[in-house]
Amino acid sequence: MADRVYNFSAGPATLPFEVLEQAGKDIVNFKETGSGLIEISHRSPEFIEVIEKTESLVRELLEVPDNYKVLFLQGGASSQFFMVPMNLLGAGKKATYLNTGTWAKKAIKEAQLFGDIDVAYSSEESIFNHVPANDAYQVAEESEYLYFASNNTIYGTQFETMPQSKKMLVADMSSDIFSRKVDVSKFGLIFAGAQKNLGPAGVTLVIIRDDLLEKTPAHTPTMLSYKTHADKGSMFNTPPCFAIYVMGEVLAWLKNLGGVEKIEEINREKAALLYSQIDASDYYRVHAQDGSRSLMNVTFNLPTAELEAKFIAEASALQMKGLKGHRSIGGCRASIYNAFPREGVVKLVEFMQVFAANNPA
């Protein structure tokens, strides 16, 4: 579509255009029912088919083992910051956390309300410009789990390989789920807000190993218990129907593209185009250290804040939107999630070359 902009925003993010087109039709008349998708009952056969299709695609594309439940919850990924320890930590129990950015730090704060939290590593002193190697921290022997955020949108860092531990892994994959291959069997729990790679805000995907459902303390509020939602197929109460529907459509698009293996190849190519341009010039500099660079969020600076402001304004005028960095570190950020088109990255790279030539430091 000619008048669509390139949306480099960290989220909500670009969705496949064909998904938007289909959603536009289905929101008016879903499957010739005479009702819009957001009007039909969540107990209707039509919506049961939607949620079952979406779960099936999650399982297929991520190769989720049979001994895991797939849940579609509300409250955003931020609610998982307290739901995880509320469900997995009993009185007097300990968990280990890696502090690699704002969202991990928020999760640590919430977890401290429920148990003894050991922060085994923090990159805060270096403005979260890297994630740790496996030998840079130790997981407490008595820990119930090791928690980390696989990708950090604000700082543009990502675990190139997932942490290794004898302890159960718990991961916030909100900004890179389905972007690369992941061995789900290595994790006790994975969660992800939808608005980066999966659809609109409103639904949070949780993948949890069956045995953990029995660990929930008896005093846990009903709505905050994973077991409640697992037992009811994510329909203890009315689920976020539209967000689940869009997730299913996005995953169907991903499957038709070639699945996670193919999108990882595409994502690596897009990121390489952008990082190569930055590395080839002294004009731009990446915030993240080598070995920690994100495939999803490329954060970079120009020589001065004034040039950054001009860069963002001129890019916006050329239909490249959302390049302003997070307020906590400034600079620029190009978020290039799964559905972000390669031609948008090429256009940005070409603009970066022209801008540097026309605006010497």
Swiss-Prot record:
Major localization listed first in the record, in broad terms: cytoplasm
The protein's annotated pathway: Amino-acid biosynthesis; L-serine biosynthesis; L-serine from 3-phospho-D-glycerate: step 2/3; Cofactor biosynthesis; pyridoxine 5'-phosphate biosynthesis; pyridoxine 5'-phosphate from D-erythrose 4-phosphate: step 3/5
Catalytic reactions of this protein: O-phospho-L-serine + 2-oxoglutarate = 3-phosphooxypyruvate + L-glutamate; 4-(phosphooxy)-L-threonine + 2-oxoglutarate = (R)-3-hydroxy-2-oxo-4-phosphooxybutanoate + L-glutamate
Binding of L-glutamate, residues: R43
Binding site residues for pyridoxal 5'-phosphate: A77, S78, W103, T153, D172, Q195, N237, T238
GO biological process, one term: L-serine biosynthetic process
Annotated GO CC locations: cytoplasm
Compartment annotation: Cytoplasm
Cofactor note: Binds 1 pyridoxal phosphate per subunit.
UniProt entry tagged with the keyword Iron-sulfur: no
NCBIfam families recorded: PRK05355.1 (NF003764), serC_1 (TIGR01364)
Subunit annotation: Homodimer.
Similarity section: Belongs to the class-V pyridoxal-phosphate-dependent aminotransferase family. SerC subfamily.
Protein's name in the database: Phosphoserine aminotransferase
Lineage: Bacteria, Pseudomonadati, Thermodesulfobacteriota, Desulfobulbia, Desulfobulbales
Gene name linked to the record: serC
